[in-house]
């Protein structure tokens, strides 16, 4: 998938609706009903008009509302604008479930860069720090789409082979990195709970301090491999790291 076109959705978010205003929290999927077309606070996030979109639908499972994604040689997502300090809200917590892997997917290769589930987080930053190659790439994206890429993008993915914790550099830009949150077939078909220190992961991936978080997205994509996949997303939340209690606190 050409992330250049897709990720512009993280940068230039319209502010014509209350649901599209950057917030200091994420609207939960479970607060919705399955009859809603889209979860509150989220909007469609497309690649381009020539790409088939992935289908996202709110459904009920075991009494809670979740998002089901169905990809058929497709790529698109849902995005939620944010305004968060990752040094304060360091912990990113979510649930996801994958029924089957994408057999041909390999995120280390640009022609097979698909994943059954992705969490995509965009960060603000000083564009003057971009190197020449990234400046050229960002300029090309802006010329093609009319929108500006975020300064940095960090993804959490489910990979076929790469080990958990591996950081994979995007083949198009050094400002897009993928962290392997889950790998292989062992945990297919069951809900998986994930918690990651996004502040630490950003520093490990980019070698610098993160700027403010400007958006989060979910994405299931199979446009490169042409395969079919179903996946499920539960609530996504950002949390503070609990401060250890001390004698001074009275405990």
PLM region spans:
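Extracellular/luminal beta-rich ligand-recognition
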Residues: 114, 124-172
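Extracellular beta-strand ligand-recognition surfaces/modules
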Residues: 117-119, 174-184, 188-226
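Extracellular carbohydrate-recognition regions
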Residues: 11-47, 132-139, 248-251
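Short carbohydrate-recognition loop motifs
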Residues: 54-76
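Extracellular-facing segments of soluble proteins and assemblies that are Gly/Ser/Thr-biased and enriched
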Residues: 88-142
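Extracellular/lumenal carbohydrate-interaction signature centered on repeated Trp-anchored short motifs
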Residues: 81-92, 185-188
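Bacterial N-terminal signal peptides
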Residues: 1-9
């Amino acid at each position: 998938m050409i992330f250049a076109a897709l990720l512009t959705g993280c940068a230039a978010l319209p502010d014509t609706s209350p649901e599209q205003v950057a917030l200091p929290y994420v609207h939960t999927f479970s607060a919705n009903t399955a009859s809603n077309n889209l979860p509150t606070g989220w909007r469609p996030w497309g690649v381009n008009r020539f790409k088939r979109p992935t289908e996202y639908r709110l459904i009920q499972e075991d009494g809670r509302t979740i998002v089901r994604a169905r990809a058929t040689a497709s790529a698109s997502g849902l995005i939620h604008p944010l305004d968060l300090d990752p040094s304060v809200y360091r912990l990113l917590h979510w649930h996801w479930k994958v029924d089957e892997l994408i057999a041909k997917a390999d995120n280390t290769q640009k022609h097979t860069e698909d994943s059954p589930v992705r969490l995509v987080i965009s960060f603000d930053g000083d564009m003057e720090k971009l190197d020449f190659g990234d400046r050229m790439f960002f300029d090309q994206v802006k010329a093609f789409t009319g929108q500006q890429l975020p300064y940095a993008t960090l993804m959490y993915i489910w990979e076929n082979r790469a080990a958990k914790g591996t950081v994979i550099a995007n083949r198009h830009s050094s400002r897009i990195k993928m962290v392997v949150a889950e790998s292989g077939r062992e945990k297919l078909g069951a809900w998986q709970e994930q918690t990651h220190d996004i502040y630490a992961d950003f520093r490990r991936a980019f070698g610098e301090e993160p700027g403010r978080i400007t958006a989060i997205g979910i994405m299931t994509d199979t446009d490169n491999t042409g395969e079919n996949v179903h996946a499920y997303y539960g609530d996504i939340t950002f949390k503070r790291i609990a401060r250890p209690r001390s004698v001074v606190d009275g405990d």
